[in-house]
Amino acid sequence: MWGDIDRKFVNSYSDASVNTLTQQFTADIRTFKLDFGAQYTAKLSAKENITLGVTFSPAHKIGGHPELKKILTNSQTSVSDTTSYGGGFDLSLPNTFGVGVMWSHNDKLKLGADYTLQQWANVQFPTFETVSGASTFALRDNQFSDRHKITLGGEYCPSAFSRKFFNRIHYRAGVSYATPYIKVNGNDGPTEISASVGFGVPIINVFNNRSFLNVSAQWAHSSAKNFISENVFRISVGLTFNELWFSKWKLE
């Protein structure tokens, strides 16, 4: 994983004699992320089985060498003063744990539940502070909270190999609840509740029976105490394709 972070905050005033303050936070990420997982399926009966899964992503430093620049400018005098802080420490990713279970009946009905924990409370993040006239930009604790996410979902397909088109469609629905990991002025950020419905249309021919055109609609609501709430509606269209699309015939 790689990328640049560049955030800029500008405080300007209508009075030209007052200095404009620009704060610029930058970091350059060049690192990796490891994900481990295990899965086991147990047969409950001739038509039922249950699948258990666990995942783990270890915490590690991702570099970045974050830097903060404070720039004071005056439009009347054209004088600019820049002070730089930081650059000698690294950002980090948290430990992430996941566990899930899925129950399947006759390859028609599937119900599942997932739980994910991201241990952001153990992650330090750089902040700027001025104490007794001394300004510092350094890594500090208690900048985040642990993030918990619970997801419930299901899928129903009347008959995957039926001659009738609508019997081969996969109908899906799900809900989720997630707590925030960010803090705003020391308060927890917005929690998020979401719900989605959708369907997968199989693309079937003599060479391919595992490709799907997926369409879904999602509603997400985020809110926090003393903050505005937000409602978001999304429409997603995707294609899950079979690797046989890229195969070529070979005659000998």
Which positions does each model-derived feature cover?
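Outer-membrane beta-barrel porins/channels
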Residues: M1-E252
